[in-house]
Amino acid sequence: MEERMITPQQLPGDQEGEVLRPHRLADYIGQTKVKDNLQIFIQAALARGEALDHVLLYGPPGLGKTTLANIIATEMEVNIRTTSGPAIERPGDLAAILTSLEPRDVLFIDEIHRLSRTTEEILYSAMEDGCLDIVIGKGPSARSIRLTLPPFTLVGATTRAGQLASPLRDRFGVISRLEFYEVEDLIRIITRAAGILNLQITLEGASEIARRSRGTPRVANRLLKRVRDYAQVWEDGRVTQELAGKSLDRLEVDPAGLDRIDQKCLLTIIQMFAGGPVGLETLSATIGEEAETIEDVVEPYLLQQGFIQRTPRGRVATVRAYQHLNIPVNSSHQEGGQGDSLFDAAED
């Protein structure tokens, strides 16, 4: 898949945005319910001198799960060890990490749903009993020893909570879903980032970027940095609404935050399948994108904004999608669509 300016996934240039990350809950904007609950749990754990209970953060990418994990460690005044599901290839890799933790440390596992089942099972006793069972030797002479681990906090992050095994999910004491951000919160995030970058920006300019940021802080910060480039070359370095709008149009991010891939997806459903329904695999083959990419990256925002609906027979474009693309709503769409493929019967 081509690199998208508005993808919520992390891009190579986003590492420069680490300076924009908040380091305390007081500086973290948005996700009020999640933040307020974590504040209570952290204060209580500190008062008791205990490790914070294990935390599962789930939701679409780019909403601040990694940032929250680091904030938890900072607020708890402990170290954080960061890894990811794909990086832990063998159970021994996870065992080595667990035995290296200091008391009350935070272990952050991104994409925790991608842990292998055998590796995942090591976490069961570690999370619940604070122990690690290790088998030494092979065959009849093999023996099992139990190591006691220091109290620690596992923070797991995932975009696919449904793929976690129930025994693992049930061992998290705190489970929080991160939602797409409201425009007002994104304006505050953009204004804060502009201050850190020593960039002059008007409220209207911040609003224009926020509206096109797909409810995602990572996208907002990325677009802000690109608009800054246009402001320095085209103008006097100050970001106004007009400058932001022209810059984002140039980047092919429309006023609703849709890019060429989003529009291609909607146009395919409308023009080739009479508005739908169309199954995921058929849509994937038609537009030339992987089904997983459509499901994880493209669809969440289109669903959240009401441009498509998912039905038992497949994806359907809504009236709002027609209106946004300036396409007349046809009778087949109003009747529920007749454009499903022969392949769609077995598809979601």
Curated annotation (Swiss-Prot):
Keywords: ATP-binding, Cytoplasm, DNA damage, DNA recombination, DNA repair, DNA-binding, Hydrolase, Nucleotide-binding. GO terms for biological process: DNA recombination; DNA repair. Has 3 domains, the large (RuvB-L) and small ATPase (RuvB-S) domains and the C-terminal head (RuvB-H) domain. The head domain binds DNA, while the ATPase domains jointly bind ATP, ADP or are empty depending on the state of the subunit in the translocation cycle. During a single DNA translocation step the structure of each domain remains the same, but their relative positions change. Homohexamer. Forms an RuvA(8)-RuvB(12)-Holliday junction (HJ) complex. HJ DNA is sandwiched between 2 RuvA tetramers; dsDNA enters through RuvA and exits via RuvB. An RuvB hexamer assembles on each DNA strand where it exits the tetramer. Each RuvB hexamer is contacted by two RuvA subunits (via domain III) on 2 adjacent RuvB subunits; this complex drives branch migration. In the full resolvosome a probable DNA-RuvA(4)-RuvB(12)-RuvC(2) complex forms which resolves the HJ. Residues 329-348 are annotated as: Disordered. Residues 255-348 are annotated as: Head domain (RuvB-H). It is an enzyme of class 3 (hydrolase). SMART domains: AAA (SM00382). This is Holliday junction branch migration complex subunit RuvB. Residues 1-181 are annotated as: Large ATPase domain (RuvB-L). DNA binds at R310, R315. Gene3D superfamilies: 1.10.8.60, P-loop containing nucleotide triphosphate hydrolases, Winged helix-like DNA-binding domain superfamily/Winged helix DNA-binding domain. The RuvA-RuvB-RuvC complex processes Holliday junction (HJ) DNA during genetic recombination and DNA repair, while the RuvA-RuvB complex plays an important role in the rescue of blocked DNA replication forks via replication fork reversal (RFR). RuvA specifically binds to HJ cruciform DNA, conferring on it an open structure. The RuvB hexamer acts as an ATP-dependent pump, pulling dsDNA into and through the RuvAB complex. RuvB forms 2 homohexamers on either side of HJ DNA bound by 1 or 2 RuvA tetramers; 4 subunits per hexamer contact DNA at a time. Its EC number is 3.6.4.-. Belongs to the RuvB family. Mg(2+) binds at T66. It is found in: Cytoplasm. It catalyses: ATP + H2O = ADP + phosphate + H(+). The keyword Secreted does not apply. ATP binds at L20, R21, G62, K65, T66, T67, R171, Y181, R218. One of its GO terms (cellular component) is cytoplasm. The lineage of its organism: Bacteria, Bacillati, Bacillota, Clostridia, Eubacteriales. Residues 182-252 are annotated as: Small ATPAse domain (RuvB-S). One of its GO terms (molecular function) is ATP hydrolysis activity. It comes from the Bacteria.
